[in-house]
Amino acid sequence: MKIRNSIYFPLVCALALSASSCIRDEILPCPPLSVRVEVTDKNYFNVHETDLEEPVDENLSFTGYISSLRYTLKNIATGDVVERKDVRNFTSGEKSFRIDFCDTLPHGTYVLTVFADGRTEKPLTFDETGENLKLHPDSSEGGDTYLTTDTLVYDAWSYDYAVGLERVKGKLLVLMESLPSDCAVADHSVKGLYDHVTPSFIYKGQSAVMKSLSVSEQDHASVLSGTLLSPSAGGGESVFSLSLKDNAGSVLPGPHDSAVKVSLRRNELTLLRYSYGSGGKLVISLYVNDHWEVVHGMEID
């Protein structure tokens, strides 16, 4: 989303303007192109439907949501990259980050793309083209990434814009209850995820994520894991698997590696619950429509 402020000069001033530029020796210089980068997705869409994820304060400064960003301004007519910059240290306490481009920038139509990392302090990783953001480099979880892309028309009347960063990934929360006493590690595997996102906010490719969670004795009663994940590839379903291991790295006997199909979406929380009982009993539930529904095998009951 972008907001444009248009300034209309009096007729006498308008006659002094050429079709493409200001006559700088007769009037004040044309204002430079300026863009305020704001955060649109401060919370997950469904964060208020569960108490397993704490909502974020909606009134923080920009640095309360974003730790680093990269912006790119590209000229549509020529395809040239006019400016690209990485920003890691924000000094302002404002609720937006302002980009002021050089006042010698020619009037024209541009595309502004901003990739950003949330408060995860993870580096932004791009593919070999340097354009597309890798969402799960080396099958890792990666950071809490944001993106905005907008077309900006820059002329004597249109030069002040606002754009909003939107969260690229969702989050999978897995609640594990009554874990076996010899459980030391919970291995997570998620297959069927998008691999990268383009500057046009189009998801492409396929990837998988592997993650290990150390489990202490105090966690056996109940432990919660959270994993940042790209949406399910093709708009379909991803497959989540959980495997429990002991201190020696051996997989524990019993139905601990049951797989579940889940639909992962950007800026949404997906909740699973693994409840272990005596005799190797395992009940898997998926949180749907404000309540837990038991999952049998790969289907919801």
PLM regions with names:
Residues 29-31, 63-65, 104-108, 155-157, ...:
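Solvent-exposed loop and beta-edge segments used for protein-protein assembly and interaction
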